[in-house]
Amino acid sequence: MSLKLAAIFKDFMVVQRNRPITVFGTGVPKTVVTVSLHTSFSKTVVAADGTWCATLPPLAAGTDYVLTVSDGTTEEQRKQVAVGEVWLAGGQSNMELALRDSADGVAVSKAYTGTQIRFYQVPKRAVLDETHQQLEAQSAWKIAAAENVGDLSAVAFYFAKRLAQKMDCVIGIVDCYWGGTSIACWMSESMMQSVAAGQKQLAAYKAEVGTKTAEQYAAEMREYEADYQKWQANIDACRAENPNVTWKELHERCGECPWPQPTGWQSPFCPTTLHRTMMQRVAPYTLRGVL
């Protein structure tokens, strides 16, 4: 295992100003890791489990910095780092709604000329597998521009745009959401087990899933996706026929949307799953707050 930064640490990233900056990753146990960013410096030792976490002293707002991490054998750098305000956009579909899909979102995206917003989208995956590793490797901090800002959460975009107008610094948004999920999906198992309601929900889900294998879950999901696509095709046909059709009329003609999805340990709707595969992958990245 060689020295490695967590996936969220990429070129063009934004780190929180005026607060201690947490930098973390993996490496060879017992090796010393040094971390520097602009005028801040820190060192730490890789733990027995191969993880490390260092804390840099606070920095004022600024841009064009280089983050350097080294264990004496391997060195990694991240360039074009900005120090500004960082917010995590979390939740379900109301936060997940992309700017391009919101009211006037396409026009707003095309007209956007700002340079002060950057965003990182945590890979949406409910299993820590090879695909998850590939998605994290491909993930990137992006400088919001007309050609990509439509991908950003609409809520987060308007929040960041207003914040950028009020503050003379770069605004960083960490997108971490999944439509239709409950808070239980984003909580650790230990936290769920610490309260009666959490214990009850975990027990109920385990009883429902039982000994279902990954293969069985995959087969159920294929059947579910086929049903959903058939329903969506009927909805699209009705809307093409009558653009002003109401949801009541759609439901009468096409039936209710197939929901919920099948249960399974690989499901994003399984309690604690997204805590492991999404939230924990970016914690403890230093933030100003959470939307």
Regions found by a protein language model. Give the residues of each.
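Cell-envelope and extracellular/periplasmic
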Residues: 1-291
